Amino acid sequence: MFAVSPSSFSPTTISPRRSGQRNEPRKFSVVRAGAKRILYGKDSREKLQAGIDKLADAVSITLGPRGRNVVLAEKDTIKVINDGVTIAKSIELPDTIENAGATLIQEVAIKMNESAGDGTTTAIILAREMIKAGSLAIAFGANAVSVKNGMNKTVKELVRVLQMKSIPVQGKNDIKAVASISAGNDEFVGNLIAETVEKIGPDGVISIESSSTSETSVIVEEGMKFDKGYMSPHFITNQEKSTVEFDKAKILVTDQKITSAKELVPLLEKTSQLSVPLLIIAEDISAEVLEILVVNKKQGLINVAVVKCPGMLDGKKALLQDIALMTGADYLSGDLGMSLMGATSDQLGVSRRVVITANSTTIVADASTKPEIQARIAQMKKDLAETDNSYLSKKIAERIAKLTGGVAVIKVGGHTETELEDRKLRIEDAKNATFAAMREGIVPGGGATYIHLLDEIPRIKKNLMEDSYEQIGADIVAMALTAPAMAIATNAGVDGSVVVQKTRELEWRSGYNAMSGKYEDLLNAGIADPCRVSRFALQNAVSVAGIILTTQAVLVEKIKQPKPAVPQVPGIPTS
C-alpha cells in the first residue's frame, strides 16, 4: 500500500518552553567522527597526484584509433570496454588519499559526460597534465591562486579562438567522420549514426536499446524530447548512466502544482497494481509530496518519476497539449477546472519507452497514438501557412519539428553480452559526439587542434604581464595542450614529441593521422572532433585542476588496521 503520511520520516522539531512548563532534562545525540588522516601542502598534493596518475594511466591507453581495451571485473561479470567515463567511474583505490585524487578526476569524466557526452578521456589527460605541472610550479614557490587565475584566463581565450575557428557540419560525410572517430574508428558505427540522423533530421532523437538478436537495426518511431530532467536523483533506475529508464510507462500530464500526495494516491495505486511505472509531468510539486514519492520509491512500493513542464508561458501550454496528444493522455488543465483529485487511470497516457536525464526527457510514443499525431502535425502545418505573425510562426515551426523529428531507436545486437555492451557504449559516444558537432561545428581531430592552439599562448601571455605567476598558469596550460596528441601517438607506437613538433609546423587543418601514419589535412581525411567536446574538455579540466592546485590539506578517514591474531599455543585453549 502506498504510504502518504510523512510522519515516519519527518524531522523532529524543537519547540520553545512555555511559562510554567516543567523543565525536562535535555537529551543530546552524540555523533562520533572517525579518526582522520591529515596531509598538508606538498605531501597532500603528491598523494592526490599519485591517485590521479593511476586513474589517468588506466584511461589514457584507450585514446585514439590504436587505443587498447580495458577489462573490467565487477562481482560476477567481466566487461571489455573502451569507454573513458565507464573506466573512470569504476576505479577505487585502497589508499584513501590517493582515492580522493582519483575521485576528483572522476568528476571531470562525469561533468564531460553530462555536458558533452564524449571526450572524457581527453579531459582526464588534460587535467592530469595541468595538475602535474601546476604542482611542480607551486612546489618551487609559485602562488597557487595566481597560477589558477592565469590558467583560467588562458583557457577562456583558447575557447574563444576554438569557437571562432570551428567549421559547421556539412552533410552526411562530416557526421560519419565525427561518429566514426568517437566510436574508436568504427566505420560501421559511423555509417549507422550518419544514416540515422539523415532519417530523423537534426531535431530528432536517438534512443539506444539492446536487441534480442545479434543484428543491429534502426527503427524510427513517433516521439519527443524536451529540456526538463528528473526532479530528484532518487528516481534514477540506471545508476551507470544516471538516468531514469521506463518501459510501457503511464503518463500524467498537467499544468498544475501538486501540493498533496492524496491527489496522486488512486493513480499510484493503480499503476502499482498493473506493475507499470508512472511519469508525472507537472508545473511543480511540493517538497513534502516529492519526499513522500521518493521514500515510497526507495521502499519499492511504487515506480515513479517527476519532471517539470517544459516550455515558457504560452508555449508551455501548447507543448503540454502536444505531449498529451502524443501519449493519448488527458491534458489536466487548471484553467479548465480539471482537478487532479478526481483524476482516473483512464486519463493517463501511454508510452513505449521513457528516458530521463538530469536535463532532458525523451518519450517514445506508443504505436496506438500515431494517427492522432499525424493529424495534429497536418493541422499545425495548415496553421503555419495561414499565420502572418513571425513569433507564432516560429513557435508553430518548433512544435512541428519536435513532433515530426521522431525518435530513432537503435537496437544494438552482439554475439556475446560483452560485445553487446561494448558496442552500445561506442554507439552512445558516437551519438553524443554527432549532436555536439551539429550544435557547434567541428575542428581537426587527433589532438591536432590543441597543438595548433599553442600558437595563441605568446599573445595571451602578453596580456598577463602584470602577474608573472599568471604567466606560469598560461605555460602550464600550454604543456597540457600537447598531452592528448602525445597519448594518441604513444598508443600508436610513435614518438609523441616528434608528432607534436611536426604538427606545429603544419597549418590549422593538418596533423598526424594515427590510423594511416601520415601527416595530412585531417578534416579531408575524416579526422574531426566536435568543437563542443574539445572546449568542454579544456573547461572541465582547468576547473578541477584549479581546485586541486589550491588545496593545502587533505583529511580522510583512517583505515582501521585489523588486530593481529593471538597465536595459538598447543595445549592452551584461547578465550
UniProtKB/Swiss-Prot annotation:
Question: Where is the major localization of this protein?
Answer: plastid
Pfam families reported in the protein's UniProt record: Cpn60_TCP1
Domain of life of the organism in this record? Answer: Eukaryota
Q: Where are the transmembrane segments?
A: none
- Residue ranges, compositional bias (Low complexity): 1-18
**tRNA-binding among keywords:** no
Q: Which UniProt keywords apply?
A: ATP-binding, Chaperone, Chloroplast, Nucleotide-binding, Plastid, Transit peptide
Which cellular component, as a GO term, is one annotated location? chloroplast
Coiled-coil intervals in this record? none
What Gene Ontology biological process does one annotation of this record name? protein refolding
GO MF terms listed in the record are: ATP binding; ATP-dependent protein folding chaperone
Write out the annotated subcellular location.
Plastid, Chloroplast
What CDD domains does the entry give?
GroEL (cd03344)
Range annotated as the organelle transit peptide:
1-32
Q: Region labeled Disordered — which residues?
A: 1-27
Which InterPro entries does the record associate with it? Answer: Cpn60/GroEL, Cpn60/GroEL/TCP-1, GroEL-like_apical_dom_sf, GROEL-like_equatorial_sf, TCP-1-like_intermed_sf
- What family is reported? Belongs to the chaperonin (HSP60) family.
Q: What does this protein do?
A: Involved in protein assisted folding.
Q: How does it assemble?
A: Part of the Cpn60 complex composed of 7 alpha and 7 beta subunits.
Name the record gives this protein:
Chaperonin 60 subunit alpha 2, chloroplastic
Originating organism: Arabidopsis thaliana (Mouse-ear cress)
Q: Which gene encodes it?
A: CPN60A2
